[in-house]
Regions:
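Individual transmembrane alpha-helices with interfacial aromatic-anchor signatures
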Residues: 46-51, 83-85, 108-121
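Cytosolic, membrane-interface loops and tails of multi-pass inner-membrane proteins
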Residues: 25-44, 99
Length: 132
């Protein structure tokens, strides 16, 4: 059985994969074409927010890969960060399941299942670390 620190490192690898999967999204979802009718400020805010979300996910991955023992320690900072990460990923589960249109989820069933399982896994790992 893996230690909690090892599970956190696995979670870091999962977060890294999520971040990497988001990199080609602008092309795949045709951001430029789909945002063409939006005002310039809306396009700019959209691109900035999308980039920052990916940056944050990469930051979570780095935190998990480089400092797993701190996150698993049960000390206040580790518990706080683990709680935040657990809540962040927990909130992502219902977004995946209920916010995105069912038809789009069906068209991309494998990706939908992989991401949903990943978000649930991350919630559990960081939830366990938060309760130590």
């Amino acid at each position: 059985m893996l230690s909690l620190s090892a599970w956190i490192q696995v979670a870091g690898a999962v977060q890294l994969a999520i971040g990497l999967a988001n990199l080609p999204l602008a092309i795949r979802l045709q951001y430029r074409r789909n945002l063409a009718g939006a005002s310039e400020i809306v396009r700019q805010v959209f691109y900035v927010h999308a980039a920052y979300i990916v940056l944050v996910v990469f930051g979570f991955a780095a935190l998990s890969l480089l400092f797993p023992t701190d996150l698993a320690s049960g000390r206040p900072l580790g518990r706080f960060l683990s709680t935040f990460l657990a809540i962040f990923w927990l909130l992502r589960v219902p977004i995946q399941l209920f916010y995105y249109p069912a038809e789009i989820r069906r068209q991309n069933r494998l990706a939908d299942v992989v991401f949903t399982v990943a978000f649930a896994f991350l919630t559990v790992v960081f939830g366990v670390a938060a309760t130590r």
